[in-house]
C-alpha cells in the first residue's frame, strides 16, 4: 500500500481537495493501487459510538487534534489538543467521498481502517463488567492513554460490524 499512517498527521491533516487530487493523480502515475484512505475515520467512529449509546461529549473528548490523529488511531493517545468540531467532521466526510471517488476512478483499491479495539473512556464507564486494558504510551499522563477492548469480548465483533456498516 501507499502512505503510512503517520503521514495523515505529519503531512496531510489540513489538505484540501485540490491538494489531495494532485497527490492521488501522482499516485496513479507511479502505479499505486492500494493507498491508505483514513480521512474522516473519526466521523465514522463518532457514528458508531453514538449507536453504542455514548453522547457527543463522551465521544468528542476521545479524539485528538487533527495533527495527532494517527497516534490516536494507533491507540497511543486520546484527547490531546482535541476535540474535533462538527464542522471538521462534516468537512472530512465530504473530502473523503471525493478522495475515494477519485481513487476508484483511477483503478485504485483504497484501504480504509476498521475497528482496532480502542474505545472511549465513556464506553469503559458504561461497561464496568467488561475487562479493558488501559495502555501507557510516551510518558503521557494517564488521562491521555487509550483503553483497549479485548478481541474475545462480544462487543468487539458488534463494534467491528458497525464500523464496516458506517
Model-derived regions, located:
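Aromatic-lined carbohydrate-binding surfaces of glycoside hydrolases
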Residues: 2-166
Amino acid at each position: 500500500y501507499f502512505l503510512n499512517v503517520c503521514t495523515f498527521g505529519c503531512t496531510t491533516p489540513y489538505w484540501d481537495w485540490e491538494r489531495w487530487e494532485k497527490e492521488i493523480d501522482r499516485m496513479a502515475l507511479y502505479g499505486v493501487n492500494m493507498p491508505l484512505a483514513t480521512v474522516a475515520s473519526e466521523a465514522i467512529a463518532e457514528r458508531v459510538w453514538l449507536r453504542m449509546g455514548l453522547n457527543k461529549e463522551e465521544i468528542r473528548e476521545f479524539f485528538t487534534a487533527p495533527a495527532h490523529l494517527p497516534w490516536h488511531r494507533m491507540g497511543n493517545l486520546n484527547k490531546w489538543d482535541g476535540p474535533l468540531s462538527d464542522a471538521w467532521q462534516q468537512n472530512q466526510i465530504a473530502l473523503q467521498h471525493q478522495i475515494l471517488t477519485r481513487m476508484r476512478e483511477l483503478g485504485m483499491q483504497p484501504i480504509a481502517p476498521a475497528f482496532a479495539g480502542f474505545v472511549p473512556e465513556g464506553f469503559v464507564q458504561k461497561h464496568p463488567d467488561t475487562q479493558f486494558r488501559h495502555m501507557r504510551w510516551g510518558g503521557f499522563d494517564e488521562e491521555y492513554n487509550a483503553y483497549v477492548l479485548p478481541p474475545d469480548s462480544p462487543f468487539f465483533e458488534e463494534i467491528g460490524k458497525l464500523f464496516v456498516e458506517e
